[in-house]
Each structure stands twice: as structure tokens, then as C-alpha cells.
Curated annotation (Swiss-Prot):
UniProt catalytic activity: 1-(2-carboxyphenylamino)-1-deoxy-D-ribulose 5-phosphate + H(+) = (1S,2R)-1-C-(indol-3-yl)glycerol 3-phosphate + CO2 + H2O
GO biological process, one term: L-tryptophan biosynthetic process
Family statement drawn from the similarity comment of this UniProt entry: Belongs to the TrpC family.
Disulphide-bridged cysteine pairs: none
Keywords, in A-Z order: Amino-acid biosynthesis, Aromatic amino acid biosynthesis, Decarboxylase, Lyase, Tryptophan biosynthesis
Lyase recorded as keyword: yes
Gene3D superfamilies, alphabetized: Aldolase class I
Name of the protein in its database record: Indole-3-glycerol phosphate synthase
Lineage: Bacteria, Bacillati, Bacillota, Bacilli, Bacillales
EC number: 4.1.1.48
PANTHER family (alphabetical): INDOLE-3-GLYCEROL-PHOSPHATE SYNTHASE (PTHR22854:SF2), TRYPTOPHAN BIOSYNTHESIS PROTEIN (PTHR22854)
Pathway: Amino-acid biosynthesis; L-tryptophan biosynthesis; L-tryptophan from chorismate: step 4/5
GO MF entries: indole-3-glycerol-phosphate synthase activity; phosphoribosylanthranilate isomerase activity
Organism encoding this protein: Exiguobacterium sibiricum (strain DSM 17290 / CCUG 55495 / CIP 109462 / JCM 13490 / 255-15)
């Protein structure tokens, strides 16, 4: 059983418990403009992530204050803040998500492994404006159902792919925001070539986000020149002495610079 399979098995157990406990219904958080619109333009957008740990890197910043970190991200110009909420493998929590959404005005992504509608309800109840759907973790029927349910619930969706076959599945879904994960979730190996290759076949009107393994402004520049509208950065910002410097430098990257 690979890492992704183990995570999904854990999620099935979590979903079973959620269905017993229930989730309170809530109104979707209101934004001034859609996240899809926010990710447009010539500037390279930053989705800045709060990430305590990961299966591949172990503990990264267990004692981080998520509110203070989120405020640093927002003040530095992050377009979206991502909060990892998986507890077993990434040591995050829904409490982190709720605290961040109350502290900042920018949209917040609930970064988790969604396999059931009740997880979307939970993310919404804790203030998320955006959820993640990982194509590799879902069959087509479930993917389509969760995608439609999220939008019907007033949330937007980042649909994550890793290869050409997954990209085709996401395109059939007519996903508006596509994340290209440079990390293979089955082996947790990373290569920026994944984004460079998949960005060759962009569809008009879709926002493309390169995720994972981005460590330098030069890499951000390369990805933007290849067609990325934004980048999702977690570990690099969590380990940085001053994440604001990195975010501000990336915010200065424009298409017309190249």
C-alpha cells in the first residue's frame, strides 16, 4: 500500500466517525471577488501554506502559531492562504483552519484529502472558501459529485493533478482552477518538470497553480514563464526566517518581464 492509499484509508475511518457525530451547517464565507478572478492577471499569485509536518519531510514547524503565520502571509500579499487540516499525517487541524479564517480577509483553502460530501460541509463550517480535490484519490463519479457539491455549497475548488491522464479527467470536469502537483503522492518524489510539461497544454479561462517543491524565486519565475498563474508554497515558507521576503519577491514576477 502506497502513501496515498494509506492516507485515503485513514480518511474513510474519519468520514465514518464524522457521519456519526454530524457536522453543523453554515453559510459560506462571503468574498469580494471569486478566487478564480483573484488568480488572474499578469502577476504570479502565491498560495501560502501553513504546514506543520508531512509524511515525506517529517516535522517542519509543529509549534507554529497559525494565526500569526497567516497574518504574515496576508500582509505580504498572498492571494490565498492554504491550511493543512489532516491531523494523522500532516499534524494540522480544523481548529487551525477556523482560527486562520477568522484572522485574515483573504480566501482560505482547506487542504485535505476529500472523499465525501461531509468533509466539504466540515470545511465550510470552519470558514474555508476553497477546497482541494485530488484526482488521483477519487473515481470519476465521486470527483464529479464532490466538485458539483462544493460549488453548490458556495465554495470554489482547486482540482489537483499529477500527470496527463489526470489532467484529462480534470478537463472533462471543466475545472476552473487546476493545481499541478510536482509531488507524486504515491511515492512522494518531486520534480518541477511535471508542471513544465503539463503547462504546455493550457486551456483558456483556467487558472493553473504549480504546487510543491518550489524553493527559489528563480523557480517561480521559470514556472510563471511556462504559464503558471500561481504557485502553492508550504515547506519553503514554513522554514524561512522571513517568509514575507519570499512572497513579496514572487509577487513581483510578471509575464511581461520575460
Amino acid at each position: 500500500m502506497n502513501i496515498l492509499d494509506r492516507i485515503i484509508e485513514t480518511k474513510r475511518q474519519e468520514v465514518a466517525r464524522l457521519k456519526i457525530d454530524g457536522v453543523a451547517q453554515a453559510e459560506a464565507r462571503q468574498l469580494n471577488q471569486s478566487i478564480h478572478q483573484s488568480l488572474g492577471g499578469t502577476d504570479l499569485s502565491v498560495i501560502a501554506e501553513i504546514k506543520r509536518a508531512s509524511p515525506s519531510k517529517g516535522d517542519i514547524s509543529l509549534n507554529v502559531d497559525p494565526v500569526a503565520q497567516a497574518k504574515r502571509y496576508a500582509e505580504s500579499g498572498a492571494t490565498v492562504i492554504s491550511v493543512l487540516t489532516d491531523q494523522t499525517y500532516f499534524k494540522g487541524s480544523m481548529e487551525d483552519l477556523a482560527a486562520v479564517t477568522k484572522a485574515v480577509d483573504v480566501p482560505v483553502l482547506c487542504k485535505d484529502f476529500m472523499i465525501d460530501r461531509i468533509q466539504i460541509d466540515l470545511a465550510k463550517a470552519h470558514g474555508a472558501s476553497l477546497i482541494l480535490l485530488i484526482v488521483a484519490a477519487l473515481d470519476d463519479e465521486t470527483l464529479e459529485d464532490l466538485y458539483a457539491y462544493a460549488y453548490a455549497s458556495g465554495l470554489e475548488v482547486l482540482v489537483e493533478v499529477h500527470d496527463a491522464l489526470e489532467l484529462k479527467r480534470a478537463e472533462r470536469l471543466q475545472a476552473k482552477i487546476l493545481g499541478i502537483n510536482n509531488r507524486n503522492l504515491k511515492k512522494f518524489e518531486v520534480s518541477l518538470d511535471t508542471s513544465l510539461e503539463l503547462l504546455k497544454t493550457k486551456s483558456p479561462g483556467v487558472r493553473y497553480i504549480s504546487e510543491s517543491g518550489i524553493k527559489t524565486v528563480a523557480e517561480a519565475q521559470m514556472l510563471h514563464a511556462a504559464g503558471a498563474d500561481g504557485i502553492l508554497i508550504g515547506e519553503t515558507l514554513m522554514r524561512a526566517e522571513n517568509p514575507a521576503d519570499f512572497i513579496e519577491a514572487v509577487n513581483g514576477v510578471k509575464h511581461d518581464t520575460y
